[in-house]
């Protein structure tokens, strides 16, 4: 077996306990990667202990964490690991993932960690265009995306995307976050000056899980939907994770290919 034949792809995700969105997002990303690179075995790891434990208890589904996956890769005789994270940004989750992966580096010839969804200028522009093509908001509506938000410096990506929407002429597309400075409350003043016929909410997250179901579109008083309706706006919600969008999944394929190309250069 040649060196590159001992290569595997490890897809690392935060995870979700919502089966429907898991199949449409994480599993679809994995499927696309498998079909794009069928010569390499594909492994999966999730980083959320809470979600992994919930799936184990509720559904009897065991999903490996990073340590288990890296140990399994070694046991299977894999010598080169190309890691493709399914994170949107390179934040705290990404930092922790890299630390755990690289703790096993001594067990392999090469460990390549590919980019998260949005790292380069091209990535961000491609996601911007993908969102516009997927949702194509009407001229009298506001399309407000719910990102996660973080205290990490990578949080700058969210206002950057908001500006990018405007740069490409999508003046009615806006970005907000569950955490951080881009909250729904901070958006309300801006909204009053826009006078939309209605507001369309959609998640800017790989999966349409707990945040999309509860924080965005839930019936509790503190959901974005409820807050906007209380202000008198007509609101519609789309529970579609970024992972459902082909153009988004294509970016992950591109990043994995770049990782495999780097590995080929190292092995040359």
Regions found by a protein language model. Name each.
Residues 1-268:
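Active-site-proximal alpha-helix that buttresses catalytic centers in soluble enzyme cores
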């Amino acid at each position: 077996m040649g060196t590159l034949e001992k290569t595997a792809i490890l897809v690392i995700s935060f995870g979700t306990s919502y089966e429907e969105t898991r199949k449409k997002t994480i599993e679809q990303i994995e499927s696309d990667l498998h079909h794009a690179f069928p010569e390499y075995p594909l492994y999966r790891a999730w980083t959320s202990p809470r979600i992994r434990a919930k799936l184990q208890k509720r559904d009897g589904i065991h999903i490996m964490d990073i340590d288990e996956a890296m140990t399994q890769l070694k046991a299977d005789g894999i010598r080169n690991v190309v890691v493709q994270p399914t994170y949107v940004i390179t934040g705290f989750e990404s930092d922790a993932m890299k630390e755990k992966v690289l703790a096993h580096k001594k067990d392999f010839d090469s460990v390549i960690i590919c980019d998260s969804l949005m790292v380069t200028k091209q990535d961000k522009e491609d996601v911007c265009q993908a969102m516009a093509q997927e949702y194509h908001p009407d001229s009298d509506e506001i399309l407000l995306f719910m990102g996660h938000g973080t205290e990490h410096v990578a949080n700058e990506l969210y206002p950057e995307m908001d500006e990018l929407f405007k740069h490409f002429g999508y003046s009615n597309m806006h970005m907000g976050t569950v955490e951080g400075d881009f909250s729904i409350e901070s958006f309300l003043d801006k909204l009053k000056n826009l006078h939309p016929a209605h507001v369309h909410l959609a998640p800017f997250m790989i999966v349409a899980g707990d945040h999309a179901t509860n924080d965005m579109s839930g019936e509790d008083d503190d959901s974005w939907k409820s807050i906007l309706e209380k202000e008198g706006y007509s609101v519609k919600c789309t529970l579609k994770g970024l992972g459902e969008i082909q153009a988004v999944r294509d970016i992950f394929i591109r990043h994995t290919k770049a990782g495999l190309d780097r590995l080929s250069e190292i092995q040359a």
